[in-house]
Swiss-Prot record:
Residues 1-23 form the signal peptide. One of its GO terms (cellular component) is endoplasmic reticulum lumen. Residues 103-107, 172-178 are annotated as: Interaction with the consensus sequence C-X-S-X-[PA]-C in peptide substrates. This is Protein O-glucosyltransferase 1. Belongs to the glycosyltransferase 90 family. It comes from Bos taurus (Bovine).
Length: 392
């Protein structure tokens, strides 16, 4: 016997009111709702930088210089120089001068390259540039003193500058990078070529990490890899401080792997080292999805990279890492979109011109707070440009 129209309507209403059968919900709508909602909120609140130059980062310069708006006196600068917290530089009549001491000559050389690129447009000034890994001006220090450092946490007043590694002086990795990481312009080209060879659909879906044990925060991922190698391929390599297998958690050190070969993998992990990790910017250019562990350590460009928009944020203790990996595997299109946004940001807003631009803007703004005329110190040598290297 056929049902009447009214009976059919009641039947449909009854079906709509019944609870769903367990296990039949769409994963993106239920199991992964928390992550999907976080991504949607992040995108709603995100304002892309459309500027063609480094003005995307101007807010970082303003914030870093805020403690010194009362002025930097000759007496304050003399005290900063005396304390040997960094290398003392002077710019006078568009020439660069430096004290003879530099703890890491290749790092100083990387810094000097960028200053010399823009020195013709800079006013007279002097500054102390820290080329150690660690920042020097904790916020409890009174008064705050002007020290330039490449990386810091929110607990420091150091003024961030683009690291020397954009040109030279990065950590040496034998045998693949014996001269150290550098030449960001050339690295960009190599990574873009590798990314083209490994489009998203061809990439290995095992999460990947290779690096030395510069921080024990990396340990949980290494241990997870040993437990579940299909989910994560993570191993420790040697560094200059390596003494025994204790430094690689009881296993032989793995071979170092070129950054371009990381592009074979969909999911790449970034950890802090002693301070911020130099690999971070490189990983994005693989077109892979970056898993960024912790949010404490910063470089000047980090604030413009947003969690869930450009990368996947991971808790410092990695307690949520397995769930996050399961999420991206179950939501491949979402993962690819985040990877593409991260890659495009670095391609568009972290070019070599942006680095040079940031140096010029930073030093120009900083010079406005010096309340005295700079005079050249005796015994300081003039720094002149070096011959350009054209390949890695």
């Amino acid at each position: 016997m056929e049902l009447g129209v009214s009976s059919q309507l009641w039947l449909w209403l009854l079906l709509l009111l019944l609870p769903p059968v367990p296990g039949r919900e769409k994963e993106s709508g239920s199991k992964w709702k928390v992550f999907i909602d976080q991504i949607n909120r992040a995108l709603e609140n995100y304002e892309p930088c459309s500027s063609p130059n480094c003005s995307c980062y101007h807010g970082v310069i303003e914030e870093d210089l805020t403690p010194f708006r009362g002025g930097i006196s000759r007496k304050m600068m003399a005290e900063v120089v005396r304390r040997k917290l960094g290398t003392h530089y002077q710019i006078i009549k568009n020439r660069l001068y430096r004290e003879s001491d530099c703890m890491f000559p290749s790092r100083c050389s990387g810094v000097e390259h960028f200053i010399l690129e823009v020195i013709g447009r800079l006013p007279d000034m002097e500054m102390v540039i820290n080329v150690r890994d660690y920042p020097q001006v904790p916020k409890w220090m009174e008064p705050a003193i002007p020290i330039f450092s490449f990386s810091k946490t929110l607990e420091y007043h150091d003024i961030m500058y683009p690291a020397w590694t954009f040109w030279e002086g990065g950590p040496a990795v034998w045998p693949i990078y014996p001269m150290g990481l550098g030449r960001w312009d050339l690295f960009r080209e190599d990574l873009v070529r590798s990314a083209a060879q490994w489009p998203w659909k061809k990439k290995n879906s095992t999460a990947y990490f290779r690096g030395s044990r510069t921080s024990p925060e990396r340990d949980p991922l290494i241990l997870l890899s040993r437990k579940n190698p299909k989910l994560v391929d993570a191993e420790y390599t040697k560094n200059q401080a390596w003494k025994s297998m204790k430094d690689t958690l009881g296993k032989p050190a793995a071979k170092d792997v070129h950054l371009v070969d990381h592009c074979k993998y969909k999911y790449l992990f970034n950890f802090r080292g002693v301070a911020a990790s130099f690999r971070f910017k490189h990983l994005f250019l693989c077109g892979s999805l970056v898993f960024h562990v912790g949010d404490e350590w910063l470089e000047f460009f980090y604030p413009q990279l947003k969690p869930w928009v450009h990368y996947i944020p991971v808790k410092t203790d990695l307690s949520n890492v397995q769930e996050l990996l399961q999420f991206v595997k179950a939501n491949d299109d979402v993962a690819q979109e985040i990877a593409e946004r991260g890659s495009q940001f670095i391609l568009n807003h972290l070019k070599m011109d942006d680095i040079t631009c940031y140096w010029e803007n930073l030093l120009t703004e900083y010079s406005k707070f010096l309340s005295y005329n700079v005079t050249r110190r005796k015994g300081y040598d003039q720094i002149v440009p070096k011959i350009l290297k054209i390949e890695l």
